[in-house]
Swiss-Prot record:
Pfam families: Methyltransf_11
Protein name: tRNA (carboxymethyluridine(34)-5-O)-methyltransferase
UniProt region (Disordered), positions on chain: 172-236
GO biological process: regulation of translational elongation; tRNA methylation; tRNA modification; tRNA wobble uridine modification
Quaternary structure, from the entry: Interacts with TRM112.
Range of residues in the leader sequence: none
């Protein structure tokens, strides 16, 4: 896949989607994972680091004794993070083009982010780019979705396709009213009766029956129109995000390919993780 094709794929199925689902996504991301928490809490006091793909910033306040700059490609998620805590150090930035000075930080984390790049070359490159911001010996904790998720509700397992599009279902909500007004449905009407052939004594009763039938017909049409509008307005909206599902050992291979030493690795919450150390 050419670079332009890969970037277009990521724009359509990653960047665009996260901006569209940002508020709902943020509501589901609030509890830090144990190993990430442990990594952050064991950084020496006064350490400075970066969270690449910080989302709503749930890891930025885990350890008050360290300093973290959070970045994300989604300005929608950065806005969510600012809403949660205005004191967070945040910026909008692509993980392949971070604005930080090289060899500046003591550590980095990138949680459930690298798997969104759509080729191996780009995934290795983003790991290399993150490492370039660390001082020699600095460590980066990287998490990616695992292929081996047989015990989870997602059901991914060894032998399945590794490059997948994962649905995100937005809750049912009233859709915005259509900008173009649609003409109201025509009420089915019966022609007004010709009273010329009706005996004078029966005309009043005959006309009253016609009015009642006309009203019943209008009520049925109004009800049908309302049901149709409700069905159009209340619907689930599904967005699809691109993921590369990492098989066991693959993330460590990518980190080594990026020039890092693998300090430690493991599995947590359907993710493979690696602590990559800059040589």
């Amino acid at each position: 896949m050419e670079i332009n094709q890969a970037a277009e794929k990521e724009q359509e199925y990653v960047h665009k989607v996260y901006n569209e689902i940002a508020p709902h996504f943020s509501q589901t991301r609030y509890k830090p994972w144990p190993i990430v928490t442990q990594f952050l809490k064991t950084r020496p006091m006064g350490s400075i680091g970066i969270d690449v793909g910080c989302g709503n910033g749930k890891y930025l306040g885990v350890n008050p004794d360290i300093y973290i700059i959070g970045s994300d490609r989604s300005d929608g998620l950065i806005e969510c993070a600012r809403g949660i805590n205005p004191s967070y150090n945040l910026l909008v930035a692509d993980g392949l083009n971070l604005p930080h000075k090289n060899e500046t930080f003591d550590f980095a984390i990138s949680i459930a982010v690298v798997h969104h790049w759509s080729t191996r070359e780009r995934r290795v490159e983003v790991i290399r780019h993150v490492l370039s911001k660390l001082r020699q010996g600095g460590q980066a904790l990287i998490y990616c979705w695992a292929l081996e998720q047989g015990s989870s509700r997602r059901g991914y397992h060894e032998g399945m396709e590794q490059d997948v599009f994962v649905p995100w279902v937005l809750p049912k909500s009233k859709s915005k009213p259509k900008t173009k007004s649609t003409p109201p449905a025509k009420v089915k009407t019966r022609p007004k009766p010709n009273l010329m052939n009706i005996p004078p004594k029966e005309r009043s009763e005959y006309l009253q029956r016609w009015k009642e039938e006309q009203q019943r017909s209008k009520s049925l049409d109004d009800n049908d129109e309302k049901q149709q509008q409700d069905q159009e307005q209340e619907r689930e909206e599904v967005k699809y995000r691109y993921y590369h599902l990492y098989r066991e050992g693959e993330l460590a291979e990518d980190c080594r390919q990026a020039g890092a030493a693998v300090h430690s690795e493991g599995f947590e919450r359907d993710n493979w993780w690696v602590v990559a150390q800059k040589r």
